[in-house]
Amino acid sequence: MAFKDVLLTLASYPEPTPVSVIDDAVSVAAALGAHLAAVSCEVHAEVRASLLGYVILDIPALIAREAAKSRENAKALLAAFEASADKSGVRHETIFEHCATASEAALLVDYARLRDLTIMAVPDSHDLGYAEEVIFESGRPTLILPTGPRSRPLRLDAICVAWDFSRTAARAVSDALPLLESARSVRVVTVTNEKPLDSRHSGRELAKNLARHGIEVVLDEIDAERKPIDEVLTSYVLSHGIDVLVMGAYGTPRWREFVLGGATRGLLSKPPVPILFSH
């Protein structure tokens, strides 16, 4: 199934999503020929204090100031989104919501469940739980965009699949098929000597499966050499000019960990390239 209905989440608090993320998301939607909806929330901070502290610190005024800051950021982000989408000719809509800080992630999950793909970034000021909630609870793939400066424009030409024969890796491949089918090159990489792998032949079998979709792949195995897995994958995608990394995620509400072991927080907090996560 092609990605035809895409969601972009724009954080307004405590710091706004960088405008560069908007342009990247619009570029993705344009490449996919998809409709793009941008959602941003006016966030109301929840402050706990004693009755005395509530009076001395004037908590209601503090909450009102922070809500106004969030509202201004959200409005500015949505206006920038509309300008970028109009310029690129991308069909779009804007969604302005109100929510408490504790319920923002759940609200985004509700919208993400009704879209083919969600695009989001994780600003430095945000806890990773902001993205984890969408990745784990939406039931849809999530494309995490880097927020730092990039040396070249975002493209979807060269894609790498991080493959370990797990259920979630298989789900990620399935969810990423629209991207894989339109890519100019696809690499499937397995990291060895990092954890036991269920099948040494699975890479070749996956290549056969993708070939039946008209996707020719290059198979690679790289030795972890006792390095953190996020460093291994980061080095690989940067040295091979990868545009998008595809990988699976698994977890429970109490304890979450991405496949490929320690790749989790390192890649989510500092993605070297856009990463398509699927659970």
Feature annotation, model-predicted:
Residues 60-76:
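A short acidic, glycine-rich active-site loop
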